[in-house]
Amino acid sequence: MRNRIHRKHREQCCLGVIEVKGNMSPIGLTTNVLIAHAEEFHGNTEIVGVNVKGERRRTSWGEVGARSRRLSSALVKMGLRQRDRVGTIAPNTCDHLELLYAISGFGGIAHTINPRLFPDEVVYIINHAGDKALFVDPAYVGILIGHRHLFETVENIYITGPKQNEVAARMNGFKFLVDLFETGDPAYEWPDLDEDDAAVVCYTSGTTGDPKGVLYSHKSIVVHASVVSLPDSFCLSATDTVMPVVPMFHVNAWGVPYASAMVGCRLVLPGPNLDGHSLIELMNRERVTMALAIPTIWEEVLEILRDAGASLESVKRILSGGTAVPSWMIKEFDQSHGVRLIHGWGMTETSPLGSVNSPLRKHLALDGDEKLEQMSSAGRPHWAMRLKIVDEEGTQLPNDGVSEGSLYVKGPTVVESYMSHEAPATDEDGWFDTGDVGTIDGDGFLTLTDRSKDLIKSGGEWISSILLEEIIRQHPLIHDAAVIGVNHKKWTERPIIIAQAVEDESPTETEVLSFFKDKVAKWQIPDAVVMVDELPLGSTGKPIKRVLREQYIDYLLEGNT
């Protein structure tokens, strides 16, 4: 066989320099490549979506792919261009799935917005992202009414789903997705895109209180999709029926919409009604084999199953993330329902999966408490993620399962910088400080023990203690205050206020908590107020939260509500 060498390479060879590069096709790793693959090779595989009324829409990867292309062309005809941001406020539905692919498919950036945020926060992130258009599910239209005049860049707002209340909608300046879809070209073909361009932006709570945008590139999304599909991750295949309970506005539903298109599994999208009864009925009727949700959801599901003497008829495994999973939950799913609970760790800045608890060969022989202990850790990193723990001086600590330090991560699915922030999010070597504290053992298994950043995770949602402190310190009767997260039976963690009153004042708990009204979302308001004579202060004059957490960690569990 004759060897063929590119002229450039021949010339370099003559100079004694050989440049060796791959000769593979330069097709980018982009999201429209994923949906094109699903449309062509998994076209008959069913997708089931539930709307706000509980009605089920049955479609397929073939139809979703075709509709996404047509909708993408409609967005371009509307005047949107590559790198324009397009906001979505919606639960997991077929419309939302099509929008996710349509927006990034032409080169736009899908901005999935959390409808649980306080309206002022929604306005802030829409303006910060510079969204040109918004798509909102009927379940969340109320969020936008009365705030549209505050949107600085939004030109059009569309309601998804079938037309309803058309007169009222148009009076508020809303249009309909179904009308926009009709303007699209069914013959539209996906363009070639740069895999390093942004495809999706999600916002995360920061310690300053203002949410920060994390831009996921096409390549990072495809890499993450391949990671979560692996046997030692979510173990997804074309034989599965997967239900992401975690919404798309939580880091792309943990990557499931992309991984599902990659492997061709059947997909069930549960819509906005995420109560335990609805989820159990949906999982059993649609024969779901894999589902993903936060521990609060799974605790409610277990309670209902326990009271009814029922079980999950087809589910083989579930993934739980967002907060730590108690060992009793792992045990009950396993022993009472034959369901394997997979515990994972991640964050918005890591796309989100950072580690997943998949056993090594030596763990297969474990049973009883030893098995539960192993399954309760945050797991080991996937191939695209590096972990390390460091001490206060930044020195890396050994992976011995004992040495405790701050957790840093690095990899192609880790944020490098936040949207519109000049400063990098990582150190000079590319390591990102997660704000978590923990240990790593010799096999790479991560155990989280604390959190160093001022964030509280309640029912899977982040609450900034800094934001709450900024508000309460403006109260005329409060001299100083600290907000900490404490244990909660249902929500895992809830904020409480430890406050010092102005001299000669004795504000009541009601007076303090009512100060948050119309300033933050109701679920962000602290559960209790503890008045103290004096707060423990550090050398900089700030309250020492570590001391307060140690003292009040079980305050709500002791009946102080």
Sequence positions of predicted segments:
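Conserved adenylate-forming
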Residues: 75-80, 185-196, 201-243, 255, ...
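Gly/Ser/Thr-rich phosphate-binding loop
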Residues: 288-293, 302-373, 386, 393, ...
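AMP-binding/adenylate-forming catalytic core of the ANL superfamily
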Residues: 96, 117, 123, 134-136, ...
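Conserved beta-loop-beta connector loops within the AMP-binding
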Residues: 381-408, 442-443, 505-509, 544
